[in-house]
């Protein structure tokens, strides 16, 4: 529901949590914001960096063609440091292809052609196709490339999945 954490304060055994939707009082506070961790938790921000991950969806393609590319209907991720991931769309009509296209944030109109070029590199026998959709989100990369899960001053945190599990 797009809750934004504005501040929090621990009083005895209760956290007073201020969000853009109002104040919440709770016994437990979990920060699971991954690439969207705010300045409210600077102790988490020092442990990782948000990196843009860009995704495209191809135009609709014949289901028989998609089935040849993804016969087991599995999600595929390469093992390079700059990761690409791809799969068939749930309706098996499009190729969903994503990854990091630049060391800096770039416009979606610029990222889509770059991803399409990489998609064609992965699947060189693709016919000429177009991109129908393009979007991006932030993933949290840790300096040791491992997820960070723990507890500090009663606040439980989980982040730094380095792109694993991106939908």
Give each language-model segment a name:
Residues 7, 17, 23-154:
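Active-site substrate-recognition segment that forms the wall
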Residues 1-15:
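A conserved short coil-to-beta-strand element within the FAD-binding core of flavoproteins
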Residues 17-19, 160-161:
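Short beta-strand segments that buttress and anchor functional surface loops
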Residues 146-148, 154-167:
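Conserved mid-domain beta->alpha element of the FAD-binding
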């Amino acid at each position: 529901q797009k809750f934004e954490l504005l501040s929090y304060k621990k009083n005895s055994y209760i956290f007073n949590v201020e969000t853009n939707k109002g104040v919440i009082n709770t016994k437990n506070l979990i920060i699971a914001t991954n690439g969207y961790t705010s300045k409210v938790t600077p102790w988490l921000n020092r442990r990782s960096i948000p990196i843009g991950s860009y995704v495209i969806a191809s135009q609709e393609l014949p289901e028989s063609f998609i089935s040849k590319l993804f016969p087991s209907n599995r999600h595929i991720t390469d093992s390079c440091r700059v990761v690409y991931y791809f799969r068939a769309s749930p309706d098996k009509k499009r190729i969903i292809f994503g990854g990091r296209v630049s060391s800096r944030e770039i416009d979606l109109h610029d990222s889509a052609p770059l991803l399409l070029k990489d998609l064609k590199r992965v699947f060189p026998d693709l016919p000429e196709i177009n991109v129908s959709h393009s979007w991006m989100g932030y993933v949290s990369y840790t300096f040791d490339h491992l997820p960070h899960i723990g507890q500090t001053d009663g606040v439980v945190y989980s982040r730094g999945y380095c792109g694993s599990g991106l939908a």
